[in-house]
Amino acid sequence: MYNKVIAIGRLVAKPELVKTATDKHVARLSLAVNRRFKNASGEREADFISVVVWGKLAETLVSYASKGSLMSIDGELRTRKYDKDGQVHYVTEVLCQSFQLLESRAQRAMRENNVTNDLVDLVLEEDTLPF
């Protein structure tokens, strides 16, 4: 049997580092991953994947990632259950074993400042052209 998850998407929110009762660091995050097809309205839908990151990997992720960061994750699919008010709840999430940020610092800064590479907004008059 083989349990492997690879996903590429954007962080829904900035991940937060939490320390457990046993002094271990954990970060929980949601990764928005676009589907390969468009719906009947012509829009692309996304799945929101729950991801858990432990230890030094969690510390590193929290230090460098922010809301909207494009990243890939590699891990295993896990299902856990817990009891709340007498009802058993099941949670399926990805246990992240590695990640990679897929945008440069410059791309991240442009995204965070809402700057795009869209040349449509750029208007040059003939007098300003160097030729």
Swiss-Prot record:
Pfam families: SSB. Gene3D superfamilies: Nucleic acid-binding proteins. Coiled coil: none annotated. Residues 1-103 form the SSB domain. It comes from the Bacteria. GO terms for cellular component: nucleoid. GO terms for biological process: DNA replication. Keywords: DNA-binding. GO terms for molecular function: single-stranded DNA binding. Disulfide bonds: none annotated. InterPro entries: NA-bd_OB-fold, Primosome_PriB/ssb, ssDNA-bd. Homotetramer. This is Single-stranded DNA-binding protein 1. The lineage of its organism: Bacteria, Bacillati, Bacillota, Bacilli, Lactobacillales.
